């Protein structure tokens, strides 16, 4: 009986499918009709530029308001995600597999020569399915890469809110849960306030859309980044005042470094002459920024991201390694990504890169790494 029950919750129910369909339809419609700043993407190799409507913040606020009203009227339960988390996870996984298979088939048959849709086929089915064939595939004029990352970030907040509602109903709401919820909500809201910065990230401008990105956006971000909330739902942790203060400082410093570094990079790409910290930017070879945070470490934004990830886990205390899965995973991922980027940059910039390394010797954490 127990085995049957455990296997049952791993299978997608009709209700979980309905939730997923409603969610995607809402995001598609809201993304098209809600007002928002239209941003030009980076210049692609064929000279084209994609346009992105950055209305994610408005779409998120409206969605939370709609769900709140529906919960108040008894139309939908705020616990639907918390109670059916595994069912939603399995439904999302199946969707990821199906949509990436469709992307593989349509990508292989594409004859488009533009940078966004030109197929890149290696001949290895698994490789092409995993890494993708096209850079910016679309469905009914919707840029799927931008759409999926938006869905993942919003999904993370919705899962957290359902966990919060569950803890209130169970009477298990704690300082730790409140702290975790506040930090994550601020991080996610800030992401959508600065959604246009996403258009200049490596994932958007260089990575093709395959299972790796789709799975990462739709399943990995919302379901694994919320592990701390799930853990706190079943484990009560009482923090001391000094622990709360330290946790807040880690979050604030991490946010300052993360947002500041990404903002400087984004602005530099848009206008290389914009002053940084009140001074003209220092640039190596006319391409590599060595001012501001980017003169402290070559990937200072990674340091901020790691501090933020740590701040999400610190409310859980140190009694278990489980809540620290996210910062540990992120540390491994960012070191791997940083190493990969260094190789690419060395090949691309050659002598300029050697001079850049001399001026900015530290990779992520100054005087340590």
UniProtKB/Swiss-Prot annotation:
The chain crosses the membrane at residues 15-34, 54-76, 86-105, 146-168, 178-195, 208-230, 240-262, 275-297, 317-336. NADP(+) binds at residues 265, 269, 289, 294, 301-302, 341, 345-349, 356. Its main location: membrane. Pathway: Steroid biosynthesis; zymosterol biosynthesis; zymosterol from lanosterol: step 2/6. It is found in: Membrane. GO terms for molecular function: Delta14-sterol reductase activity; NADP binding. It comes from the Eukaryota. It is a multi-pass membrane protein. It is an enzyme of class 1 (oxidoreductase). One of its GO terms (biological process) is sterol biosynthetic process. Pfam families: ERG4_ERG24. Its EC number is 1.3.1.70. GO terms for cellular component: membrane. InterPro entries: ERG24_DHCR-like (IPR001171), Sterol_reductase_CS (IPR018083). Keywords: Lipid biosynthesis, Lipid metabolism, Membrane, NADP, Oxidoreductase, Steroid biosynthesis, Steroid metabolism, Sterol biosynthesis, Sterol metabolism, Transmembrane, Transmembrane helix. It catalyses: 4,4-dimethyl-5alpha-cholesta-8,24-dien-3beta-ol + NADP(+) = 4,4-dimethyl-5alpha-cholesta-8,14,24-trien-3beta-ol + NADPH + H(+). Belongs to the ERG4/ERG24 family. Reduces the C14=C15 double bond of 4,4-dimethyl-cholesta-8,14,24-trienol to produce 4,4-dimethyl-cholesta-8,24-dienol. Required for cell division and expansion and is involved in proper organization of the embryo. This is Delta(14)-sterol reductase. It comes from Arabidopsis thaliana. The gene is FK.
